[in-house]
């Protein structure tokens, strides 16, 4: 049971933790012999590392139709995807796959939606395992921007199958989408 003592202008609550009471009164903090202090070590989130970046449409009936995909490391200045190999389930001849990583924001890459059982996807091989901090998708400017809704990004390991990180699907219609790890949403 706690007792309350009033002395002068101070009020002291005496209880099982006299250390806390002493601190409230301006006394010096002394290490509790029962619960020693442990240093606080900040937790720094790790960035995903992968060799493949896969765009997947969550709708089994929609196509992927985008102007550009950019992938950046922590330094953030070099686009790792520029000029890399892009493969797909099937592509539309009006939107060749290399357009996705050519640096030109006015052309586009386009899938065909021929494999309804799995939905459309595009796979970019970065050439080696890279630490990835940011992914930027540029939508088409001339039409069909709503087609980006439902696309998510999956970072895969060196074997091309091990999932390292997966973003949520895009839910809004916009000109560009940026995902910065360890984030939780596209902006």
Model-derived features with residue positions:
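Single-pass alpha-helical membrane anchors
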Residues: 2-30
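Preference for bulky hydrophobic residues occupying beta-strand positions
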Residues: 55, 124, 137, 153-155
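Extracellular beta-strand elements of beta-rich domains used
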Residues: 69-71, 135, 153
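Ser/Thr/Pro/Gly-rich low-complexity linker/stalk segments immediately outside membranes or between
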Residues: 26-44
């Amino acid at each position: 049971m706690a007792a309350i003592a009033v002395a002068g202008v101070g009020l002291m609550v005496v209880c099982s933790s006299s250390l806390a009471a002493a601190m409230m009164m301006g006394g010096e903090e002394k290490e509790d012999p029962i619960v020693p202090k442990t240093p606080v070590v900040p937790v720094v989130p790790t960035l995903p590392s992968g060799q493949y970046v896969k765009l997947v449409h969550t709708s089994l009936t929609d196509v992927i139709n985008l102007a550009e995909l950019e992938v950046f490391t922590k330094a953030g200045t070099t686009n790792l995807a520029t000029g890399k190999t892009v493969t797909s389930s099937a592509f539309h001849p009006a939107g060749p796959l290399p357009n996705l990583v050519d640096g030109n924001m006015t052309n586009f890459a386009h899938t065909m939606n021929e494999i309804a059982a799995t939905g459309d996807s595009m796979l970019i091989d970065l050439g080696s395992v890279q630490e990835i901090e940011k992914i930027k998708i540029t939508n088409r400017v001339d039409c069909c921007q709503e087609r980006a809704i439902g696309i998510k990004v999956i970072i895969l390991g060196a074997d091309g199958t091990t999932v390292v990180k997966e973003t949520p699907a895009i839910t809004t219609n916009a000109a560009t989408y940026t995902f910065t790890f360890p984030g939780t949403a596209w902006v």
